[in-house]
Amino acid sequence: MSSKEQKTPEGQAPEEIITEQHDDVEAVEPEVSAEQVDPRDEKIANLEAQLAEAQKREREVMLRAKADEDNLRRRTEQDIEKAHKFALEKFVNELLPVIDSLDRALEVADKANPDLAPMVEGIELTLKSMLDVVRKFGVEVIADTNVPLDPNVHQAIAMVESEDVAAGNVLAVMQKGYTLNGRTIRAAMVTVAKAK
């Protein structure tokens, strides 16, 4: 046996020993490099964090913009709906004096006079047809008596003592009021009953 063969551990060839030692050295090197952080890895991690934050901000901005757009669309639709619903308001306001004049003409007309009967009937029919037309477009008359005073549709002109009507109720309508699609165009001018 040669001296080389004696120094090698149990039947290993010298090349195998060198390869084993070389593997041990390589195994040690990664441990050293794992302790040292590569500045490029740090920069990549930092950039990834910044990217994630920027994406989050962009997502929030997009959601906010979408919500604003939805709100604007909804408001615009409501405004258009209201404009269609109340487009006749100005026209109806112009018609109210005509309707009031026909009402007053009927109040003062001498209905007992047979000579005026055709004229009174003509005024009644004209008033009825005009009210029918405006009702088709959502106009309602406020002229009820013996109902509780509602400041949204009544304007109290005076308070009068009454035994027939409960206190706080409408006793008489001095001038009719009108609503258009539920919105008061003109409040009814009324006298209100008060307790004795």
UniProtKB/Swiss-Prot annotation:
Stored Gene3D superfamilies: 3.90.20.20, Head domain of nucleotide exchange factor GrpE
Pfam families: GrpE (PF01025)
GO biological process: protein folding
Subcellular location: Cytoplasm
Assigned GO CC terms: cytosol
GO molecular function: adenyl-nucleotide exchange factor activity; protein homodimerization activity; protein-folding chaperone binding; unfolded protein binding
Listed InterPro entries: GrpE, GrpE_coiled_coil, GrpE_head
Key words, A-Z: Chaperone, Cytoplasm, Stress response
Coiled coil: none
Region (Disordered), start-end ranges: 1-41
Family listed: Belongs to the GrpE family.
Function as written in the Swiss-Prot or TrEMBL entry: Participates actively in the response to hyperosmotic and heat shock by preventing the aggregation of stress-denatured proteins, in association with DnaK and GrpE. It is the nucleotide exchange factor for DnaK and may function as a thermosensor. Unfolded proteins bind initially to DnaJ; upon interaction with the DnaJ-bound protein, DnaK hydrolyzes its bound ATP, resulting in the formation of a stable complex. GrpE releases ADP from DnaK; ATP binding to DnaK triggers the release of the substrate protein, thus completing the reaction cycle.
HAMAP family in the cross-refs: GrpE
Subunit note: Homodimer.
Protein name: Protein GrpE
Organism of this sequence: Klebsiella pneumoniae (strain 342)
